[in-house]
């Protein structure tokens, strides 16, 4: 086992990364090894997808499968070995199919089929035991003694960034947003990473390409969500429970939320969002369901307590899932799509009747809590609508600075930095937030500036796209570069989606971003210095010191 993809990973003087019997996230060594082997097989599929494309062969089913299966290897997504094995077996079948199609096309064109790299040649074992015996060939640091640590760090930066992009591709696909050109470039990068390059310059350039690719993917996802559910609107949301039977929907998948809402109409069940599903409450399409009553709980790391206290059924539509046995709710939590936990019921297809039956059988909430309201819904359209007023308030001096504070949440104590930062921002500043990092301060009162709320909840982590659009619009109005705006970006990272959002911002030339609370363990000191020198990327320090720098206070 070697896994170093999330903030929780082990850090010791002897080296970083989880490499024993179990990772800090709870992932067993066998699961980690199977996921590495799955990635290896997917890279082999991409090798043939690239070669097949050169001869005009495009398989949309395979284009969708590879990022979806890759998504299953993100932090806190799938802990079920049997599901990972099944993905690997399917990858082997798809690779064989593409290989046959490619070789036939070569024969018809009078060409000799090209030799493929080792990553596309493995004969996958037929059982879990056999696959585990093959896992060493796919270990991410298998050649660590033969290469410079910076090369390994760059490979991992690319791999983990591409994982984040794969997740957004799958979220977009669910909403019928696909792009053959994007899929083709995705395969090219997967195939390149499968070759274990030692070219640092090419790896760094690839990391930037992944950021650019993800910008297109986030635009696709934005289109999918707004075309399916309308543009988010500023919306007041209750964060307390309501009397009645209950279903809690966590993750990121709004299509699943829509299906659950449709199937619970007239059933006497209240539906709540959780975590990154909170922004759904601002979409017009969901407002026609009066039984979507609000948001329950907070960010992913608190789920074992929050789900244990929730007297209904829980659906995990995507990351992040953690051990449901700790809170003794494994019999009433359901996984969906790429999510998996051993022994937990998995919903296949679009029938959520098992979830509904479980909710009806459970007690539900016995009384209404005193409501606590927050305002959400400041995504792209709402931000653009507010732009003229924002510009006027900047010009008259009422708004002097913007802060984008968001990203992933986590359970480390030093994440209180983000709470204190938000509370310490000047009264003449605007705070934009997104991702589950918002839960560090989104229930606090920040007031407004001439009717403009000081705290603007932009949405999910992928809605960084909306914040980027606002920054571009403001830069155009003020005829300046984005980096010349009175804008400071402070991103909390935990896993691979945050990595790819960061790569996207860097690839767009955004500078002087702060990340925290700890730097990724796979980034060497040399790589961190390169990123600081090139982009001004730095780690958070103290709220007081960082604010002085961001506000240019001597």
Curated annotation (Swiss-Prot):
It is found in: Cytoplasm. Hybrid [4Fe-2O-2S] cluster binds at residues 252, 276, 320, 408, 436, 461, 495, 497. The modification Cysteine persulfide is found at residue 408. Its cofactor is [2Fe-2S] cluster; hybrid [4Fe-2O-2S] cluster. Transmembrane segments: none annotated. Binds 1 [2Fe-2S] cluster. GO terms for cellular component: cytoplasm. Its EC number is 1.7.99.1. SUPFAM superfamilies: Prismane protein-like (SSF56821). GO terms for molecular function: 2 iron, 2 sulfur cluster binding; hydroxylamine reductase activity; metal ion binding; peroxidase activity. The keyword Glycoprotein does not apply. InterPro entries: HCP/CODH, Hydroxylam_reduct, Prismane-like_a/b-sand, Prismane-like_sf, Prismane_a-bundle. Its main location: cytoplasm. GO terms for biological process: response to hydrogen peroxide. NCBIfam families: hybrid_clust, PRK05290.1. PANTHER family: HYDROXYLAMINE REDUCTASE. Catalyzes the reduction of hydroxylamine to form NH(3) and H(2)O. HAMAP family: Hydroxylam_reduct. Belongs to the HCP family. This is Hydroxylamine reductase. The gene is hcp.
């Amino acid at each position: 086992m070697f896994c170093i993809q999330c903030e929780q990973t082990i850090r010791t003087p002897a080296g970083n990364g989880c490499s024993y019997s179990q990772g800090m996230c709870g992932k067993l060594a066998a699961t980690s090894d199977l996921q590495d082997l799955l990635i290896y097989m997917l890279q082999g599929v991409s090798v043939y997808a690239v070669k097949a494309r050169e001869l005009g062969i495009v398989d949309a089913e395979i284009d969708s499968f590879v990022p979806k299966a890759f998504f299953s290897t993100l932090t806190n997504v799938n802990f079920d070995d049997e599901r990972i094995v099944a993905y690997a077996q399917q990858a082997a079948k798809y690779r064989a199919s593409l290989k046959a199609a490619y070789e036939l096309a070569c024969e018809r064109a009078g060409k000799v089929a090209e030799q493929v790299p080792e990553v596309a040649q493995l004969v996958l074992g037929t059982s879990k035991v056999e696959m585990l015996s093959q896992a060493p060939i796919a270990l991410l640091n298998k050649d660590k003694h033969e290469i410079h640590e910076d090369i390994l760090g760059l490979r991992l930066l690319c791999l983990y960034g591409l994982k984040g992009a794969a997740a957004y591709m799958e979220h977009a696909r669910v909403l019928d947003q696909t792009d053959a050109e994007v899929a083709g470039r995705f395969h090219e990068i997967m195939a390149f990473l499968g070759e274990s390059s030692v070219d640092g310059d090419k790896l760094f350039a690839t990391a930037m390409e992944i950021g650019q690719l993800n910008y297109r993917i986030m635009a696709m996802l934005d289109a999918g969500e707004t075309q399916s559910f309308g543009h988010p609107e500023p919306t007041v949301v209750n964060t307390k429970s309501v009397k009645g039977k209950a279903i809690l929907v966590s993750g990121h998948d709004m299509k699943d939320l829509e299906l659950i809402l449709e199937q619970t109409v007239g059933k006497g069940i209240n539906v709540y969002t959780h975590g990154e599903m909170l922004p759904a409450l601002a979409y017009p399409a969901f407002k026609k369901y009066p039984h979507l009553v609000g948001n329950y709980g907070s960010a992913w790391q608190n789920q074992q307590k929050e789900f244990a206290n929730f007297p209904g059924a829980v659906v995990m539509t995507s990351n992040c899932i953690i051990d449901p046995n700790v809170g003794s709710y494994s019999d009433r939590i359901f996984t969906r799509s790429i999510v998996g936990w051993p022994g937990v019921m998995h919903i296949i297809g679009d029938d959520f009747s098992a979830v509904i039956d479980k909710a009806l059988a459970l007690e539900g909430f016995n009384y209404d809590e005193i409501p606590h309201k927050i305002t959400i819904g400041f995504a792209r359209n709402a931000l653009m609508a507010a732009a003229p007023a924002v510009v006027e308030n900047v010009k008259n001096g009422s708004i002097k600075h913007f802060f984008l504070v968001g990203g992933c949440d986590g359970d480390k104590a030093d994440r209180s930095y983000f709470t204190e930062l938000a509370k310490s921002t000047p009264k003449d500043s605007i705070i934009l937030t997104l991702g589950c990092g918002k839960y560090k301060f989104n229930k606090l009162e920040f007031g407004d500036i001439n009717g403009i709320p000081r705290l603007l909840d932009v949405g999910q982590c992928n809605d960084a796209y909306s914040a980027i659009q606002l920054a571009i619009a403001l830069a155009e109005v003020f005829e300046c570069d984005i980096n010349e705006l009175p804008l400071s970006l402070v991103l909390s990272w935990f896993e691979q989606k945050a990595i790819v959002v960061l790569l996207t911002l860097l690839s767009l030339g955004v500078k002087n971003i702060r990340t925290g609370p700890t730097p990724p363990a796979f980034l060497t000191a040399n790589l961190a210095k390169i990123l600081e020198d090139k982009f001004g990327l730095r780690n958070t320090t103290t709220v007081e010191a960082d604010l002085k720098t961001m506000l240019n206070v001597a």
